[in-house]
A protein has these predicted regions:
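Sec-dependent N-terminal signal peptides of Gram-positive bacterial secreted proteins and lipoproteins
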Residues: 2-22
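Subset-of-secretome marker
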Residues: 21-332
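Generic N-terminal leader/processing signal
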Residues: 1-2, 122
Length: 332
């Protein structure tokens, strides 16, 4: 199922490359111009920042409490196209219930000898002197085929997959560069269309999968606003902003309420003030991306955790901490 879903994810990823609209052009011709502009790019470098400002408001009927949650992070991303590889290095600061945590991260994804994808990720928290590595290899992924597929998608393909774009009537200026401003929205309806298209191509109803159905339920109401700024002269996307600030949090709030079901008369509401990502990108030669020897040694020695297990534990920990935080607020 993972391999089949990759097709849909590739479509969503390719959406970030559909740029450079001009009123005298069609979407297809502009998309081709973008492909021509990026075809010779041997690599790309991105500087990215993210911000989360949220709160959980809790009430037991007589007392109201608010639990602030904040997160900020900066990341530097490098990518090469042949072979396909990425390097992500950055850090995050998290704060909740008056407690702060600083985390340093780095991740390396490289094309394996069999064409699959190998990912090595390192995390070090402020309470951890050494940090630890996690590893995953997926041989079901053919990175070369995925790259070829993303380059072959057209604007018409995007529409078929539920992705539509809006071009601002006026040019925007980004770091002194005149740019086209192109925006799109990815929501549960978009994801549902992608899932149905993947099901058609796979000859299998993926919506019947329990894990997929549960994920779609969690995503219901969430909305991702994306704006791309495209160099008007080169048709290269040089900046991007994303936010989820227009999301309907009804479903997430119902999950929080379920976690507090044991607390009679208690209600809780998640308030999202800002959840955004900003990135700027440059194109050109990027130094070869290599996995650090310490990461390879950790895997060989069996000291690296599974990335799948790490992800599952993070989700479980987040759910537990949210419930405990809300319960503690009520107790106060």
């Amino acid at each position: 199922m993972k391999k089949k879903l990759l097709l849909g994810l590739t479509v969503l990823g390719a959406a970030s490359m559909l740029c450079g609209f001009d009123s005298a052009e069609t979407a297809d011709s502009l998309y081709q111009k973008m492909l021509d502009a990026t075809a010779d790019a041997s690599g790309a470098s991105m500087s990215m920042g993210m911000n989360l400002d949220a709160a959980i408001n809790v009430s037991d009927g007589t007392t109201d409490s608010s639990l602030g949650i904040s997160m900020s992070g900066t990341f530097d991303v490098n990518a090469t196209m042949d072979p396909v590889a990425t390097e992500v290095i950055g850090s995050m600061d998290l704060s909740a219930l008056g407690q702060g945590q600083h985390m340093e991260m780095k991740s390396y994804s490289v094309t394996a000898e069999d064409g699959g994808l190998e990912t090595y990720s390192f995390t070090k928290e402020s309470t951890d002197d050494e940090g630890s590595w996690a590893y995953n290899k997926d041989s079901n992924i053919d990175m070369t085929s995925l790259m070829d597929l993303s380059k072959s998608l057209t604007a018409a393909d995007m529409a078929d997959w539920g992705l539509t774009f809006t071009l601002a009537p006026e040019a925007a200026t980004v770091n002194g560069t005149e740019c086209y401003e192109l925006s799109t929205v990815i929501d549960s309806s978009t994801l549902d269309t992608v899932l149905k298209k993947v099901s058609e191509l796979a000859g299998e109803d993926l919506t019947s999968d329990q894990d997929v159905a549960m994920a779609m339920q969690y995503l219901d109401g969430l909305k991702l606003n994306i704006t791309y700024y495209v160099d008007a002269a080169t048709y290269l996307p040089v900046s991007m902003t994303m936010d989820m600030n227009d999301s309907d949090l009804t479903v997430l709030n119902s999950l929080i309420a379920s976690a507090l079901a044991s607390e009679e008369g208690t209600s809780a509401e998640l308030v999202l003030n800002d959840f955004s990502i900003n990135a700027t990108t440059s194109y050109g030669d990027v130094a070869a991306i290599t996995v650090p020897q310490e990461a390879i040694d950790a895997v060989a020695a069996g000291e690296a955790a599974s990335l799948d297990d790490v992800a599952e534990n993070l989700v479980a920990d987040a759910e537990t901490e949210a419930a405990e935080a809300a319960t503690e607020a009520v107790a106060e």
